[in-house]
Amino acid sequence: MMPGIFTGRVQIKYRYGRYGYTRGGGKIWHGGMDIVGLDSTDIRMPHYKNKRITGTVTRARRVTDHSNKTWEWGWYVCVKLDASQTPDDVNFLYFCHCRELKVQPGDRVASGDLLAVMGQSGNAAGGYDHCHLEARATANGKGLDPSQYAGCPNAVGVYGEQQKTNDDPTKMQLITVGPVSRGDADAVYTLCRSRGLVDAGLYKSEWSVG
């Protein structure tokens, strides 16, 4: 599988999450792909058919005015692609329904860069965390097929391989740090706690006097 917007496995969970899906007698048309990151919630700038691409963040916001159709996207990021990188008509990529944004308008981004965190803000159908990925030729144009950027086909299923980690419990390393200041010690403790080392009893700290 080509690199997409998530690291590891991804899923198209429902039929209505596919690009081009219609319902309501053809009155409602889905202009993007609803992609779930199974191994990571971090939304990243994708590749195009394994090719690295670059662009500029033009919008990173949430619209609350319901007269503006984009309120349905919730928190979203728009990236304008640099010119002449791909042979298709896509110039803008939208990453929608985010829980948290990691970029600001004006930021330069490239394939693999962190853009946002997957969520279900706005009018996210189904009540599950995902990213609505939309591709457009113009900022206000109709959605184009985003599958070459998605990292998976435009079909229901699970795609990709689970990312391997270096967390081999048979290979443990003893690390001694210090002496350090109280601020540095607190930072080390916070990191160890986030990695689960404190709860596992693998973190030890001693204060010296004098």
Regions found by a protein language model. Name each.
Residues 54-58, 105-122:
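Active-site-proximal beta-strands of protease catalytic cores
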Residues 98, 166-210:
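Solvent-exposed beta-strand motifs enriched in subsets of small alpha/beta binding domains
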Residues 5, 9, 13-15, 53, ...:
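Polar, enzyme-active/binding microenvironments
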Residues 1-4, 104-113, 130-171:
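Acidic, glycine-rich catalytic/binding loops that coordinate metals and/or anionic ligands
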Residues 37-40, 89, 179-183:
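Soluble non-cytosolic domains of exported or imported proteins
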Residues 41-43, 101, 107:
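Residue "hotspots" at secondary-structure boundaries inside conserved domains
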Residues 46-102, 124-132:
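Zn2+-dependent peptidoglycan hydrolase active-site motif and core
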Residues 11-49:
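Short glycine/threonine/proline-enriched tight-turn/helix- or strand-capping micro-motif at secondary-structure
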